[in-house]
Amino acid sequence: TDKVIVPVSFLYINAFRKALCQRLEISDMETEKDYASAESGVDGYLQDVLEHIIHNSKRPTYFFPDGSFPDTPSFKKNLYNEGLVFRYSTHPYDNVAVAKRNVEERYAFQYLMEPKFVCEEQWKGSERIQLNYMVMLAPIVKSYKEDGDTLHANQLTRYLSAAVVNTSIPQEEKQKYIHLLSTAK
């Protein structure tokens, strides 16, 4: 196909990033380790990699937003959260209904309620995977509330809150995610 969807956290994995750049027929970027020793430091690493992919691939590239995604307006048109279906499908698609069905019938969130779910140590972004649920499902909490379905709204809120609380991200960052949930009225 002519579209590529990139899970942002995977860009920290050198083998993935190299394979992606090869697939897109663009040059690879420096590694995060190289950035750590550079004057600019690692803070701009992810943003630089994303910009490199967007500008050099010369094709539609979409990013799966997750907890590590930079809050940069220039990337908004490159975000993917089932939005491509709206753009390219010839048939009507109700992504809220699909997300609700997945929450109610397919996703198994119980592990998020464990006091301390431990992700794989060898992958830097692995703990942040839990935060992907927040990006994808916070709007569904709002939809449940609008529909008067407090049972599912409260249950999903508990799961998503646990996903945030049980990470080791800084407290200030946790508060941003919790605020996202609390504003889903």
Where are these regions (language model features)?
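ER/secretory pathway lumenal C-terminal domains and tails of membrane proteins involved
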Residues: 2-185
